[in-house]
């Protein structure tokens, strides 16, 4: 058998570990041929590929980013929307001309949706979910999330000392456009006093009261963790807006910090390396067993899979009955 691997969408710690997990399992255990497709689905359209062997897959386990490159282009979706039916056929043609028996698509929600569309066309496809946002429906955790939470938590830990020294409010903005998983997990792990996520509406007056109540109790500084996707006035970044509103409400000097792309870069944590390796290996096992049109998932501590058509278009969001939200509120943490 011959399989192709591509990575699409934003970069994420653990992609290379996944490529390694798929490739080494395929080559060393199943005797398959493996090629890497450059720059996501664009590389499939252009037949921009490389052949993998055991040696070329060595030394990449701990590397951030993706050795295959990536892009956010979704040519398949755009072409279908514009009615250019010849281009989807070009994808099929190139798949066949490359001699592929299966395509492994490593990516987030958009990538898995595209993978599902390719599967519906009759191509053999396996999806492997990746995003630091942890918002892909059907899997408990996506690789990259643990690394991002570790980076954000370390930043929050460091900001505690400057906040306490200057008796300030520090507002830390982390990634999470539609889902607040990073803010929730890093905010709880980092001892945040206020955690704001897109899923839970907030009241700036209540936030101000929380901070002033801390001041009355002899706690002259506060840590506020916000997801980038919370509602603002539409003109400012989340952290900037919340910092200005808090300072206006409380009169306490407030500063903001935006972590940005640092959360996506660098070496994956041991947890993410192991999760990526397991997911990659399971993807190859499905291929060997002829089980296509599925996305790899983590359920509890077990690697499993789900049909791609059940995944497409669905987001996994934080709910108010999430155990971390419930426990945080019990300890006096303000969620808005």
Where in this protein do the model-derived segments appear?
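Glycine-rich oxoanion-binding loops at beta->alpha junctions
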Residues: 46-103, 143-150, 154, 336
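C-terminal non-catalytic interaction/assembly regions of soluble proteins
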Residues: 238, 242-336
């Amino acid at each position: 058998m011959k399989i192709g691997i591509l990575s699409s969408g934003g970069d994420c710690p653990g992609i290379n570990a996944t490529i390694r997990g798929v490739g080494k399992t395929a080559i060393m255990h199943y005797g398959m041929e493996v090629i890497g497709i450059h720059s996501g689905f664009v590389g499939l359209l252009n037949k921009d590929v490389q052949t993998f062997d055991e040696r070329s897959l060595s030394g990449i386990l701990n590397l951030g980013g993706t050795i295959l490159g990536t892009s956010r282009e979704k040519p398949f979706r755009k072409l279908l929307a514009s009615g250019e039916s010849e281009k989807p056929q070009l994808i099929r043609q190139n798949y066949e001309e490359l001699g592929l028996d299966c395509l492994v698509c490593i990516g987030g929600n958009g990538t898995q949706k595209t993978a599902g569309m390719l599967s519906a066309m009759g191509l053999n496809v396996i999806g492997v979910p990746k995003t630091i946002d942890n918002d892909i429906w059907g899997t408990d955790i996506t690789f990259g999330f643990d690394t991002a939470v570790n980076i954000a938590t370390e930043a929050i830990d460091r900001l505690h000392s400057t906040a306490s020294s200057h008796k300030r409010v520090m507002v830390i903005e982390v990634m999470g456009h539609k889902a607040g998983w990073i803010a929730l997990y890093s905010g709880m792990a980092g001892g945040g006093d206020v955690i704001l996520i897109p899923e839970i509406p907030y009241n700036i007056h209540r936030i101000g009261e929380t901070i002033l109540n801390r001041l009355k109790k002899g706690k002259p500084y506060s840590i506020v963790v916000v997801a980038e996707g919370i509602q603002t006035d539409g003109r400012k970044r989340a952290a900037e807006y919340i910092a200005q509103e808090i300072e206006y409400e409380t009169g306490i000097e407030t500063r903001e910090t935006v972590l940005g792309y640092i959360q996506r870069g660098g070496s994956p944590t041991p947890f993410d390396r192991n999760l990526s390796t397991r997911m990659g290996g399971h993807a190859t096992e499905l291929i060997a067993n002829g089980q296509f049109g599925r996305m790899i998932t983590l359920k509890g501590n077990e690697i499993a899979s789900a049909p791609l058509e059940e995944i497409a278009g669905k987001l996994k969001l934080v709910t108010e009955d999430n155990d971390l939200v419930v426990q945080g509120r019990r300890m006096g943490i303000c969620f808005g």
